[in-house]
Each structure stands twice: as structure tokens, then as C-alpha cells.
């Protein structure tokens, strides 16, 4: 089968943008960060809009605006991010991460799916409609450079923003098969860095092995008290506040791709015999805890006096991030032996967010996507977290979280890619979405 054809005016700029190594995770280079932001700014102004690079305390925010072709039009905010994850390990890439390459029906590059390749078609649709005088809504553009670092500055900026906004569209999610999908909710999150210390300095294991505590040993013992059980379920203190999935959601799971298949497609291994059956409940309506990183020691046969773990907990709807972070710290502190100390750093978190699928904005989006893609638009949840959603929900802004990523895009990993057809689907869907929202 021939690869889908993407118009050059849609594909070529994306390839240009993907060549910019706008890595925001440490260590970051401010030059490509600014270059990627200026790329977005130039695209907006070239289409007749206005755009500024705003200093919100970190990497520049691109804040743009396209005026509607009629008075008293509604205002819609579109959001994306220009920053990307570190591409290491480079040796696992088939082609260099910042040399975009088409192989088969996919475009390979860091950021191809998350989020440059996903967001650009939406921005492209706004630019093209603005140039043709076809925008029946005011479009505000917010494109940030710190999403991969938690979006703290962006969240603060958006929470303080007082511009009237009737809806928000976010292209940073995925589709279901060939159908567009709208995400009506995601989980919350807490993160913290836990450091256990057992002495003043590292000591020689030949002189003190078995006589003094090893910080790695103590950290791992502590972690066993907060890790999930063999079925993936967390201890009661970390499950406080969960409400379970409503009947309507459970009915949707019956027609969804089986959990076992999703795990297989992603290249994972089921944790237990029930992981497939419980996939949707576990990832949408239950909390989960992961140790994402452990740092300590060296191969020098010394006993480390300090060990650090980075822990993340995905929160179920209705769980409060402050409560679960406090419970996590209480458990860790309570099981620590008297000869060790613990420190918590870099605490962060946000609550889960949900949006009413029957809101007029979401109904309009569903109509637009169904018309543009030719398949009935689906509703879904995600197990991930977009901190911006919490801010938007608290501001009462109905949000269409969508996009055209797929399960096999390998975001954040080597050989990240994006289907060529997703690029054209995203542009067509964006145009239809703007048209339907203009009718409200």
C-alpha cells in the first residue's frame, strides 16, 4: 500500500520544526528552545495574526491571536507545546532524532507525535482559515516550552489569565482506530524525590560491610511499603477518595479494544492474570504508583550513605493530590529505621480533571470530527495527566482534549513516529472543529 500523501504546505513546515532540538528536560539549550518558539510566532504572524513571546518565568510562552470574520464571535483557545523530551539513548534510533525521516507510512523524529506533529495540523488549520477570512471564531494560541517539565509556569500564567475564553482545544492526545476521539478526563498526579541518608560519607565495604547501614538497602526496604501489590493495587492509604467508574463508562469498555491487546500492542507484559480484564479500571479510575528513577552508589565497592528515588503516583478522579502526597510521606516516614533520615524534594501535583461530554462545545466537536474523518467520533479517558486540564476545569472552560496520536508512536522513546495520515486527519479535523464551534 502506498504511503498517504500529505500536502507539501502541511508537511514541509512540520519537518522544518522537527529539526529544531527543543529539548526542555535537563540539560536544556536555550537557543533551540527560543528558535522553536519563534517558529510558532512566525507562522501566526505570517497568517495575519498577532503573536508575542511571553516571559512567564521560564521558557517563552507563545501567545497569539486570530480575529474572527464577524463581530461578537466566541473565543477559542488552542494549546500545544513545542518542547520535546531528551532523545537519549541515541544509539537506539534508526535515524537521528532531529533529522525527520519518512519510512513507510510514518514520519520519524523526536516530537513527531508529542507534540509538534500533533499540534501543527491544528495550528495550520487556523492559519489557513485566517488567511482566507474563514474563521468564524476568535482563536487564541497558547504554545508552551515546558510541558515536558510539568508546565508549572504555564499553569500559573493560565490561572491568572483573565481573557474571556469560551472553549479550549488541545491536540495532545490520540485517536481510536481510524476514528477521532475526545478525551473527557485524565488522572491527577503527584511526584516527589525521596532521599534516604544513613551516614556522613560513603565507606569502604571491606572495612565496614555488615557493620553500617547501606542507603540503597534502606531505600529499597522503604519502597516495598508503598509499591503496588502483585495485582497492581495500592495500599489503602493511597486509595483514599476513589469513587469507581460509573455504569456508562463500564458499558463503553465492553466495545473498546481489550486490555490484553493494548498491552500487547505497546510491547508490555501483563503484571498479573487480571491485568487485561482490569486495564480500563486500573488506568482510568484507580491510582497507580511507579518508581521512575533510583540514583545512588557506584561500582567502587563502597557503601553508599545516600540514595534517592523519584516517585510518581497517578491519581484517580476525586482524589486530592495534597492528601495523597501527605499519605505517601507518612507511610515512608513511619517505616524508616531510627538510624536513617529522609528528605522529600521537588514535590508537585495536580488533581484529576473531567469534562461533561454533553456540553454544547463537546457535542459540536463530536459533530465536526465525525463529518471530517468519516467515522463516528469516540469518547475516551486517559490514564495520563495534563496539568493544564486542572486549571481549565477550575476556570470552567469546556475543553476538547483530542489529537491523532496512536499507541505505537513510541512517544518519549527511540524511533518516535507519527502516521502520515494523522497529519492530514488533524488538519481536516481542526477545520471542521472551528466551523462547528462558530455555529454555537
Q: What does each model-found stretch correspond to?
A:
Residues 1-90, 306-310, 322-325:
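N-terminal helical capping/dimerization or prosegment-like subdomains
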Residues 73-143, 425:
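Active-site metal-coordination/substrate-binding segment of hydrolases
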Residues 209-231:
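A short core secondary-structure module
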Residues 136-214:
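Histidine/acidic-residue-rich, glycine-tolerant segments that coordinate divalent metal ions
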Residues 71, 85, 151, 177-178, ...:
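An extended, acidic, His-containing surface patch that forms the Zn2+-binding/catalytic region
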Amino acid at each position: 500500500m502506498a504511503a498517504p500523501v500529505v500536502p507539501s504546505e502541511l508537511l514541509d513546515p512540520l519537518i522544518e520544526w522537527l529539526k529544531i532540538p527543543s529539548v526542555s528536560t535537563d540539560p536544556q539549550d536555550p537557543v533551540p528552545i527560543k528558535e522553536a518558539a519563534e517558529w510558532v510566532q512566525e507562522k501566526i504572524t505570517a497568517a495575519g495574526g498577532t503573536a508575542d513571546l511571553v516571559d512567564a518565568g521560564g521558557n517563552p510562552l507563545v501567545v497569539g491571536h486570530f480575529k474572527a470574520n464577524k463581530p461578537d464571535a466566541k473565543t477559542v483557545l488552542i494549546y500545544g507545546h513545542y518542547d520535546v523530551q531528551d532523545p537519549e539513548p541515541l544509539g537506539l534510533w534508526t535515524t537521528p532524532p532531529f533529522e525527520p525521516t519518512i519510512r513507510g507510512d510514518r514520519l520519524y523524529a523526536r516530537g513527531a507525535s508529542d507534540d509538534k506533529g500533533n499540534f501543527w495540523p491544528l495550528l495550520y488549520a487556523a492559519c489557513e482559515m485566517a488567511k482566507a477570512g474563514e474563521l468564524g471564531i476568535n482563536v487564541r494560541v497558547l504554545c508552551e516550552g515546558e510541558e515536558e517539565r510539568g508546565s508549572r509556569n504555564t499553569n500559573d500564567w493560565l490561572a491568572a489569565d483573565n481573557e474571556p475564553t469560551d472553549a479550549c482545544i488541545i491536540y495532545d492526545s490520540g485517536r481510536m482506530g481510524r476514528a477521532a476521539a475526545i478525551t473527557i478526563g485524565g488522572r491527577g498526579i503527584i511526584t516527589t524525590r525521596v532521599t534516604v541518608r544513613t551516614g556522613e560519607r560513603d565507606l569502604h565495604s571491606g572495612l565496614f560491610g555488615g557493620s553500617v547501614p547501606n542507603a540503597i538497602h534502606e531505600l529499597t526496604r522503604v519502597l516495598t511499603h508503598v509499591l503496588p501489590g502483585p495485582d497492581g493495587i495500592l495500599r489503602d492509604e493511597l486509595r483514599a477518595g476513589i469513587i469507581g467508574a460509573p455504569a456508562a463508562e463500564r458499558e463503553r469498555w465492553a466495545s473498546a479494544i481489550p486490555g490484553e491487546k493494548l498491552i500487547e500492542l505497546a510491547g508490555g507484559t501483563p503484571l498479573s492474570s487480571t491485568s487485561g480484564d482490569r486495564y480500563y479500571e486500573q488506568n482510568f479510575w484507580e491510582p497507580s504508583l511507579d518508581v521512575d528513577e533510583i540514583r545512588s552508589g557506584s561500582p567502587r565497592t563502597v557503601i553508599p550513605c545516600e540514595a534517592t528515588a523519584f516517585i510518581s503516583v497517578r491519581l484517580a478522579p476525586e482524589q486530592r493530590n495534597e492528601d495523597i502526597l501527605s499519605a505517601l510521606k507518612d507511610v515512608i516516614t513511619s517505616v524508616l529505621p531510627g538510624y536513617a533520615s529522609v528528605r522529600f524534594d521537588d514535590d508537585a501535583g495536580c488533581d484529576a480533571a473531567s469534562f461533561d461530554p454533553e456540553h454544547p462545545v463537546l457535542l459540536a466537536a463530536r459533530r465536526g470530527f465525525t463529518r471530517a474523518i468519516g467515522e463516528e467520533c469516540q469518547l475516551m479517558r486517559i490514564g495520563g495527566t495534563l496539568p493544564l486540564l486542572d486549571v481549565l476545569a477550575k476556570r470552567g472552560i469546556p475543553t476538547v482534549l483530542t489529537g491523532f496520536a496512536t499507541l505505537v508512536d513510541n512517544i518519549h522513546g527511540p524511533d518516535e513516529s507519527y502516521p502520515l495520515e494523522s497529519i492530514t486527519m488533524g488538519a481536516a479535523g481542526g477545520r471542521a472543529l472551528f466551523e462547528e464551534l462558530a455555529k454555537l
